[in-house]
Amino acid sequence: MSKVTIPQGYHASLSVYELQRAIEFIKSNFQTNLSNALNLRRVSAPLFVEEASGLNDNLNGYERPVSFDIPDVHAEAQVVHSLAKWKRLALKRYQFNVGKGLFTDMNAIRRDEEVDNLHSVYVDQWDWEKVIAREDRTVDYLKRTVRDIVGAVCETNDALGVAFPSLHTKLERDVYFITTQELEDRYPDKTPKERENAIVREHHTVFLMQIGGKLKSGKPHDGRAPDYDDWQLNGDILMWNQILECAFEISSMGIRVDEASLDRQLTLAGCDDRRDLPFHKMLLHGELPLTMGGGIGQSRVCMLMIGTCHIGEVQSSIWDKATIDACRSAGILLL
């Protein structure tokens, strides 16, 4: 059965040709706005990493990476889930100074993703990472960076509306900040997803903070790997999707673990076996720079600004027959 939802009366605002122009416009303009706002430089990034390196992102802990052997180099490789750990190592290798960072065009395969209007097994992100000082590992610094990112999104959307007058997406620049515990306290009888919808429906642009650790209910709001974000200094940028009428995550980000928070979170997550991996050893010994970073979904941003109802309208992927048939019946072209 298809999990696709098609809003009543929905139709594409642009022809396929104009849609491709709009996607190019968004990607070109946003990466410029983002790099200027956060002082980032574009770098090349890997599609796969060695399994033994520990550099792949374990996401929520259950997703299986796409793996393959490379006989000529006697190694097992994994297609990346994200570049969260690779970026931090790259900042050290490339000798970035405090206040400067990098961004990449990240392409990933998440084979265990449950596909629907918003989710695909193909993931495309602007992955970014920045060197910070120890005194910048604060909630205030995190909030300032969130506001900078939201500003870059809104500036791009404003420019898109001028270039493509048939597009009318309105985005809220003012960010409402709330922790996952505060959100649970406000809506104790709702599921995490229902809580997100309720708060974003009210405030339109929300940064939901402190994701990964257990709440008073005994459950985390959502899963986070223990070895990249500091669970006290991270969060998701959520915007209201006018087409689907739901909370719409465009970015997961945070200040990264230092030696103490990595040590604590590995124990809490039952992942002490990772301490012997090369990346984790370097981090625990203080050999990597202190950083913050995140991923910003390219297809998600395009969906939001162009006003499409399915992510397959702005990216090429593979879909089940029920989804293809439902979209075809509604006149929706999946790329």
What are the roles of these predicted feature ranges?
Residues S2-H119, D127-V131:
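Class II aminoacyl-tRNA synthetase-like tRNA-binding/catalytic domains
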Residues E18-F25, N29, R137-R144, D148, ...:
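Generic recognition of stable, solvent-exposed alpha-helical segments in well-folded globular domains
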Residues L34-R41, I149-L160, C309:
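A generic secondary-structure signal for well-formed alpha-helical elements
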Residues L47-E51, P165-E172, D320-I324:
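A glycine-rich phosphate-binding loop feature that marks nucleotide/adenosyl-phosphate handling sites
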Residues F68-I70, K92-V98, L118-S120, H168, ...:
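A general structural signal for short secondary-structure junctions and capping/turn motifs
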Residues K100-L102, V123-D127, H203-T205, E245-A247:
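Extracellular structured ligand-interaction cores
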Residues T104-K190, E194:
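Extended, charged alpha-beta segments that form solvent-exposed binding/catalytic grooves
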Residues I109, T180-L335:
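A translation/RNA-centric and nucleic-acid-associated enzymatic feature enriched
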